[in-house]
Structures are given as structure tokens and as C-alpha cells.
């Protein structure tokens, strides 16, 4: 029996008023996940569109399915009009109906039947104008104001698709559970969007859509695909993300025109050797499955530019990966990889290589050949050192992330390895020294993260890091901050928490662009008066030190929004704290010697949070303290000798 036989007449193949056959090819759109990320399914336009030869293409049919990438028009707005752009009017807008009778941009009002006018409002059908290709006459049609709720509505949609020769059909986000067999009659379809429904299986008749090029089935409950899908020999994009597939359906391996295949977030445990048949693939996403082995078949996919196998259980990669010489993005992060094959060096077009969070103890020296890479990230492995001079060979690198490994020293290769780098992250290693002159060629270096290492001192040439914007030296064993810190006048973020600093140099006042200064958990007793010169400072964190008083110059920090001096030895707060007009959060809790607050604190009108826990404030009644910042400030104001405040 021929599943694809139907009563459709040949007239459905042409919708041009001149009798000219309509052009092949669907409306552009329908992109999905890109580079392993979550993408959408393209714009869903409405209405017909003009072709290059002046004839009219078949319109797109889009049902309202809520907001999202398809973006159908909801309510009583127009579905299309004569002045629609090429990809259809109203697809991306997602606008809702206003409740008024709309008028199309071509001047035609929506038509109402006289009988409808006499019907009660609650039973009167909503009317929308659909521009039919063979005529400029508006055609009334019924449109629900809510997403499709019942599967019988799909039957009507498919009938209309058949009758009007629709090429692009969007039934996404419509709570559909079953696709009826009448889908076989929609022979003009080139794009079909069924994502975000409740579909458990596809009918065999789906194979009748032999013109289909883009099929989006993501976010359903599919466990298999019908064998008849192999008849869709022109299919180029297949999106099966977020389903319940335990294996790659065998029929997929026979879709040899596929260029893009998304299988992310399923339950796939293995990849068959038949994968080698998909030689036209340029993008393959197997992200977030349960795959333990990637066979040699991957090497046959020589046209691949993007391969995402992240978040699986891979322990090894086949040497054949080196045959995929057109790869520009290879994502291997969050696996259990123990090694990387030497053949990786054949991938000379590689720009991005994700190796984060694996079980690597080393990387191959052949990576030197991948000179197009702009980012090198091996965070969360067990690497102790990189191949000698490898980073220097990768002269295009701008970002280097070596955090959460076992480095005891900086990578070998000298200053040349950081020439074009603007961000270096070596957090959570065992490095005890930053080599003198290591950044002498790094003129563009703006971010350095050395948090959670074993540094006891900073290099004498720290003053040459003049372009540094963000410097994180937290959780080390630093005992002194060099005076030359004053030369880092582009610095905006300085984090020195959890060290052994006893004082801050007066030259700190030269860092006029500083926005965040974190000195938490040190041994600081006194802050320099020059702290008041940091007029751009927004966050000052001083908690868990041994500070006995704040300098009066703190009143000059007009942009300060967050001040934490909890767990210190404060005896009082300076009156100048009342000048902090931008202050929103003030932590002064656990200062056992702080017995009173200055009345001037009431001038901090923007204060939203005040923590005074475990401070013996004998002058303020407990019930006032328990009432929160506003009540405390009100009490201070009422009892102030300056009633005019």
C-alpha cells in the first residue's frame, strides 16, 4: 500500500494567479542550536512572499504557540499582508491582539459576516486576513486566540496546509500528542516545526514529505523514528534535542543529505559505525548523552566544522578525529578523557577546543600546530605542566584558562607565550611565584586571576602591569603589597581577601579607577588616609581584620554602595560616614567595642540594609534595633542634636 497516495489534485502545486508553477525552496529560517549551545528554530513568518521573477511563493502557516523562537502572532492581529517582507510579516514580533478590529497595511479591513455581527461576542468567531497568492482579495479565516490545545485542530491546520500549498508550517508549542496521517498531503512542505510538544511517535506518513529540508522535533518524547523518514532524501537539518532516544535511530544514517544533526540531551549510549555514511554533515551535536565511546567512523565526516560531544562519558578519542581537518570548533568538556590523541594536531582550522573538566594529566605537543586557536581552556583537569613552548606557538591566543589543575609553576615558554593574551586564569593551583618579567610582552593583559595558590610575594616588576583592569590575588599567603601598585592606574577590581596583609600602602590612593577593593580576612589594623581618594569606589570589603577605626576621609567615597567592616575591633564610626549618600548596604556587625552610632548616619538616605548584630549599642533601644535600618535611622534622626537633618 502506498502511504503517500491522496486525493489532492495537481492544482495544489501552483498557487500563482498567472498559472506559473511556484518556485522551489522554503522561506529562509529554521536555524537551531549553534556550536553546542541552545538555539531556536528560526523566525516563523506569515503570508506569501515575492520571488526574484515576480511570481508569488506559497505562504507560511504559523499557529500561535506562545513566545519563543517561532514567535507566531497571537490574538486578532493580521497573519499576513501584502506588504510583508520576504520572510513573512509578524513572525518575530510575537505581538498580541489588541481586541480592536485590525486593518491590514494594504488598506483592506478584516471581513465580518453580517450574521456574525448579530452573534453574541462570546460566540462570534475571531477573524483574520490571509493574503492568498492568486488574488488580492482578503480571505476570512477563523483563528484561535490561544495556542492549539487539541489534536483535532492539527487536522484543520494540515488541511489548510494542503489546500494553500504551504511550504513552511510551524506547529510548535501547541500541546500536540499525535500527528495525523493526513500529514502526507502536505507535499509542498520544505520546513516543518513541531518542537516543544508532547509527541511520542511520528506516523509513517511523515516519509511522504519528500521535499522536506528542515525538520524540528526537539523537546518532545520521541523514542524512535519511522523507517519511512528515509524517503525525505532532501532533508538537511534535523533537530532531535531533548527527546528520549536511547540510540541514534538507524534511519538517520540513511539521510545522506543531512548537513546539521542535533541529538543533544537524549539517552544515547553508543554511536554506530554507520555514522560514516553522513559525509555531508557540517554540524553534529551529541552533547549531554551517555556515550562512552566515539568510534573511528567519526573520521569519515571530513566536512564537519563543529562537533560537540561534551557532557558524556568519553574516556578516549579515536586517532581518526585527526581526519576531520575542517573542524573549527571541537567541544570535549565534561567527559572523562584520560588523554588526547596526537592526531589532534592535524586540525589546523581549529579555533575553539573545549577540554574543561576531564581527567587529563597532559596534552599533546602536537597542539602547537593548531595556530588558529584564540582560546585555550583546560580548567578542571590534573595537568602539571604544558609541553615546552606550546603556548608561545599558539600566537593567536587571547584567553588562557589553566585553573583547577596541578601546576606548581608557570608554563614554560617565557614572556613570548603571553604576547597577545588579555586574560589569564591560573586559579586553584600550587604556584608559589609569579616569575619576574613574565608579562613583559603582554601589553594587552587586562585580567589576571591567581586566586587560591601559594604566593608569598609579588614580583618586583608589578608596576609594569599598567594595563591591568582586574587583579585577583585572593587566598594566598601575601604579607605585603608593593608600593609600585600605584602604577596600575587602570585597575578597577582588586581582590586581596584571605591573605596575611598587615597594612595597605599609602600609594593605594593612586588607583583612581578602582571600583571594587576586597581586603577581607587579612590582619590589617589601620587603613591609610589616602583611601578617601578612591572616588570611583563602589564596594569596600574590610570584614574579618583587626581594624580599630575608619579614617575620616572615608566620607569622600561618594559612589560607595557597599561597606563591610564586620568582625573587626571598631570603637566608633566617624561622623563623616553621613556623607556616603550612595550607601545601600552597611555591615558593622560583630564589633564588640562598638557601643554607639553617629547621628550623622541618619543622613544616609539610600541605606537599605544595616547589620548591627552582636554590637553592644547601649544607646539604642533593642526594639529599635530589631526594627531594621529605617527604624534605626529614624531613631538617630529624632534624637540627633541637629533636628534639621
From Swiss-Prot:
Composition skew (Low complexity), residue ranges: 1-19, 98-107
Repeat region (LRR), residues: 165-186, 188-209, 211-232, 234-255, 257-278, 280-301, 303-324, 326-347, 349-371, 372-393, 396-417, 420-441, 444-465, 467-488, 490-511, 513-534, 536-557, 559-580, 582-604, 606-627
Domain of life: Eukaryota
Region Disordered, annotated ranges: 1-67, 83-151
Keyword vocabulary terms for this entry: Leucine-rich repeat, Repeat
Biased composition (Gly residues): 26-49, 88-97
Family: Belongs to the SHOC2 family.
PANTHER family to which the protein is assigned, alphabetical: LEUCINE-RICH REPEAT AND IQ DOMAIN-CONTAINING PROTEIN 4, LEUCINE-RICH REPEAT-CONTAINING
Role: Acts as a Ras effector and participates in MAPK pathway activation. Probably acts as a regulatory subunit of protein phosphatase that specifically dephosphorylates Raf kinase and stimulate Raf activity at specialized signaling complexes upon Ras activation.
Protein name per Swiss-Prot or TrEMBL: Leucine-rich repeat protein soc-2 homolog
Organism: Drosophila yakuba (Fruit fly)
